[in-house]
């Protein structure tokens, strides 16, 4: 990894809560100064920011990164068939080496498309932590616990999470954080859910869970418990400001009140929800109710990539057509979802370009045909940009990508290893 301790991004268009032209000085892992008076002698490394939009690194709040190995598996199936007949049988063959290879490939893809932080739930997470440490990205990692209402399995799952906390939490200079990650109300017993929250509270960790992804899930729980998923989770004290609920597609007005009151964050996954025909999450309604909504890609096999630029555009367009109102979810609100809202959900001091924030920064090339003319840089980022327009990525003050070249990952090796790993599944 680069030894650079100071970086100057010179004369660039900065996109954060407002648009301005200035230079940015990074010292160690922090944005030290934003000014027009900075000189090339102020830093040991200077990056030319002209013809670039400089923006916060994107925050992917729901992923299963090692599922890169399952790209193209189970296409065109609805969720339960997709899980039961395609995904879970292949996941049963996973081991440490395969998860590491899949994670490394995902890091390469995420860095090259401007993601600097991701919130992940999967298996063999120590291997993903290792890939995070090596690649320089930032990850919140949870072991996906599923007990299928079996007592012995519950004990094993809690033990696995405790081991992950012990081995990986707050490692890699703080870039690896651990979350407690019970999979979903329909795969986890009440006891596992309760123990998960106690564990999260004890260690002051985030709790990451799938909730109300499909109508079937909601209907089944209502039949069993006479409660909707969020009502059920609230009844066992699972909801608070440290809860990140992935999907939240089928949410009632009463649940909206609960989510606002408990300050729960929602991770919206538009590509996945569309591909699996799960439904359209009521994002504009969440925002009207002052609920923090961020964006996630979900796993590659229900997307089928990790490009957060695609997710931003889909998020905006889907809400506009769903409400039949073109003014719904304007570009700034969408941008905030993929940056500062995600950072808020994860409790990380990033998501905007301001002095004192962590230096997680992406430079996007404006000088390409589909970005010209640049009348409004914000509009271009949401509606025109592609992940492949990312030119430079800095995370925690370290250069991870420069001139589109990965600096911390050998891309050829990552691709080769992932191809071999995928063959074993």
Curated annotation (Swiss-Prot):
An individual GO BP term: S-adenosylmethionine biosynthetic process
Recorded catalytic activity of this chain's protein: 5'-deoxyadenosine + H2O + H(+) = 5'-deoxyinosine + NH4(+); S-adenosyl-L-homocysteine + H2O + H(+) = S-inosyl-L-homocysteine + NH4(+); S-methyl-5'-thioadenosine + H2O + H(+) = S-methyl-5'-thioinosine + NH4(+); adenosine + H2O + H(+) = inosine + NH4(+)
Cofactor binding note of this UniProt entry: Binds 1 zinc ion per subunit.
Enzyme class name: hydrolase
Record pathway: Amino-acid biosynthesis; S-adenosyl-L-methionine biosynthesis
Keywords: Hydrolase, Metal-binding, Zinc
GO molecular function: 5'-deoxyadenosine deaminase activity; 5'-methylthioadenosine deaminase activity; adenosine deaminase activity; metal ion binding; S-adenosylhomocysteine deaminase activity
EC nos: 3.5.4.41, 3.5.4.31, 3.5.4.4, 3.5.4.28
CDD domains: ATZ_TRZ_like
Domain of life according to the entry: Archaea
Binding-site residues for Zn(2+), renumbered to this chain: 62, 64, 210, 298
Membrane-spanning segments: none
Ligand binding (substrate): 91, 183, 213, 298
Cofactor: Zn(2+)
Record function comment: Catalyzes the deamination of three SAM-derived enzymatic products, namely 5'-deoxyadenosine, S-adenosyl-L-homocysteine, and 5'-methylthioadenosine, to produce the inosine analogs. Can also deaminate adenosine. The preferred substrate for this enzyme is 5'-deoxyadenosine, but all these substrates are efficiently deaminated. Likely functions in a S-adenosyl-L-methionine (SAM) recycling pathway from S-adenosyl-L-homocysteine (SAH) produced from SAM-dependent methylation reactions.
NCBIfam families given in the database record: PRK06038.1 (NF004701)
Subunit structure: Homotetramer.
Family stated for the protein in its record: Belongs to the metallo-dependent hydrolases superfamily. MTA/SAH deaminase family.
Miscellaneous note of the record: SAH is a product of SAM methyltransferases and is known to be a feedback inhibitor of these enzymes. As a result of this inhibition, organisms have evolved efficient enzymes to metabolize SAH via different pathways. The pathway found in methanogens differs from the canonical pathway, it uses the deamination of S-adenosyl-L-homocysteine to form S-inosyl-L-homocysteine for the regeneration of SAM from S-adenosyl-L-homocysteine. 5'-deoxyadenosine is a radical SAM enzyme reaction product which strongly inhibits radical SAM enzymes.
Designated name of the protein: 5'-deoxyadenosine deaminase
Organism for this UniProt entry: Methanosphaera stadtmanae (strain ATCC 43021 / DSM 3091 / JCM 11832 / MCB-3)
Source lineage: Archaea, Methanobacteriati, Methanobacteriota, Methanomada group, Methanobacteria
């Amino acid at each position: 990894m680069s030894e650079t301790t100071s970086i100057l991004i010179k004369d660039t268009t900065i996109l954060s809560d407002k648009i301005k032209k200035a230079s940015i000085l990074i010292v160690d892992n922090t944005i030290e100064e934003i000014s027009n008076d900075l000189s090339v002698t102020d830093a040991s490394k200077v990056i030319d920011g002209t013809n670039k939009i400089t923006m916060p690194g994107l925050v992917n709040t729901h992923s299963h990164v090692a599922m890169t190995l399952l790209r193209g598996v189970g296409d065109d199936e609805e969720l339960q068939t997709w899980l039961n007949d395609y995904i879970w049988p292949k996941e049963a063959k996973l081991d440490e080496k395969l998860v590491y290879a899949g994670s490394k490939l995902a890091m390469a893809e995420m860095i090259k498309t401007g993601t600097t932080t991701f919130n992940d739930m999967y298996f063999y997470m120590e291997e993903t932590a290792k890939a995070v440490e090596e690649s320089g990205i930032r990850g919140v990692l949870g072991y996906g616990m599923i007990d299928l209402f079996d007592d012995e399995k519950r004990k094993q799952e809690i033990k696995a999470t405790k081991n992950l906390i012990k081995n990986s939490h707050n490692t890699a200079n703080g870039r690896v954080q651990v979350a407690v990650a019970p999979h979903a109300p329909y795969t986890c017993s009440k006891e596992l859910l309760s123990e998960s929250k106690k564990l999260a509270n004890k260690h002051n960790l985030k709790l990451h869970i799938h909730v109300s992804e499909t109508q079937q899930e909601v209907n089944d729980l209502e039949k069993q418990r006479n409660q909707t998923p969020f009502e059920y989770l609230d009844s066992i004290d699972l909801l608070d400001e440290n809860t990140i609920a992935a999907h939240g597609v089928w949410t009632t007005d009463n649940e909206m009140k609960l989510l606002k009151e408990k300050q729960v964050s929602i991770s919206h996954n538009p590509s996945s929800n569309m591909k699996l025909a799960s439904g359209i999450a009521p994002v504009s309604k969440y925002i009207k109710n002052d609920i923090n909504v961020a964006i996630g890609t979900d796993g590659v096999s229900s997307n089928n990539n990790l490009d957060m630029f695609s997710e931003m555009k889909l998020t905006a367009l889907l809400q506009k057509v769903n409400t039949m109102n073109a003014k719904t979810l304007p570009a700034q609100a969408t941008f905030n979802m993929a940056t500062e809202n995600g950072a808020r959900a994860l409790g990380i001091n990033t998501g905007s370009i301001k002095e004192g924030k962590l230096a997680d920064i992406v430079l996007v090339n404006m000088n390409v045909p589909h970005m010209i003319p640049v009348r409004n840089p914000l509009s271009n980022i949401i509606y025109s940009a592609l992940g492949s327009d990312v030119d430079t990525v800095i995370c925690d003050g370290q250069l991870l990508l420069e001139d589109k070249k990965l600096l911390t990952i050998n891309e050829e090796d990552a691709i080769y290893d992932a191809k071999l790993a995928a063959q074993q599944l």
